[in-house]
Amino acid sequence: MAERLSEEQIAEFKEAFSLFDRDGDGCITTMELGTVMRSLGQNPTEAELQDMVGEVDADGSGTIDFPEFLSLMARKMRDSDSEEEIREAFRVFDKDGNGYISAAELRHVMTNLGEKLTDEEVDEMIKEADCNNDGQVNYEEFVRMMTEK
């Protein structure tokens, strides 16, 4: 995953890693991570810090080394990319830009994609995604629908 990062990104992450690695030993401890996160206005619990370290601690050392840090950053970047793609897709469906996808908007986009759907099929799609039963799909509902496995 880290192999998809540019040299420029890797250099930036090396700089950030050095900020985290307060004692310069080449590893970030949960304590160092906590210090930096608090300086950035975050207030993680000890358990949250351990989870973050554990998420990328491939060698089980209890700390994050630079390759593990790169892996974490690459994953975070990939996650934010897909978030932007979902937002973009929502805008395509939300023709009038009111923050909701109506049955008419869904039918219009699906027809343009070459999908001939009956009114019942469109209504069923809306009903499936519409958690609060207001007859349309808001952004949160759309994200949930798009990210469900």
From Swiss-Prot:
Which Gene Ontology terms of cellular component type are present?
centrosome; cytoplasm; myelin sheath
Domain (EF-hand) ranges: 8-43, 44-79, 81-116, 117-149
InterPro entries (UniProt xref): CALM/Myosin/TropC-like, EF-hand-dom_pair, EF_Hand_1_Ca_BS, EF_hand_dom
Q: Which residues carry this modification: N6,N6,N6-trimethyllysine?
A: K116
Q: Name one Pfam family in it.
A: EF-hand_7
Q: Which family does it belong to?
A: Belongs to the calmodulin family.
Q: What is this protein called?
A: Calmodulin, striated muscle
The gene for this chain is CCM1
